[in-house]
Amino acid sequence: MPKLKTILIAEDEPDTANLLQFHLQRRGYHTTVASDGVNALNLSFERRPDLVILDLMLPKLHGFEVCRMLKASPSTCHIPVFMLTAAASTENKVEGFRMGANDYMTKPFAMPELLARIELLLQPSHGS
């Protein structure tokens, strides 16, 4: 039986985190939630998830910095980072990609689109 894919949800809004957890677990993913940037970074280094869903406006450490640090480390640089945020400006999107994000989606979002993007990012061809 194949190993369940693990997704780290870095989201400080509990309702959004719970919604993501619910839908991802229904799709067969194992999930962990981090409510601030420092916790997200630590959990990423400790658990090495298969994907990180990353909000930008996180307490303690901004999502751009979390992404930059994950992509700079040899132990986590292969992990796809999917930014999911209300920051919808072109400047924020460009900065997210510059920091190493593999995808960027704005809130509010459509769950079917989010799940399709996650499935694409988790395909072997999108790995390291």
How does the language model describe each region?
Residues 109-119:
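C-terminal output helix
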Residues 18-26:
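Charged docking surfaces used in two-component/phosphorelay signaling
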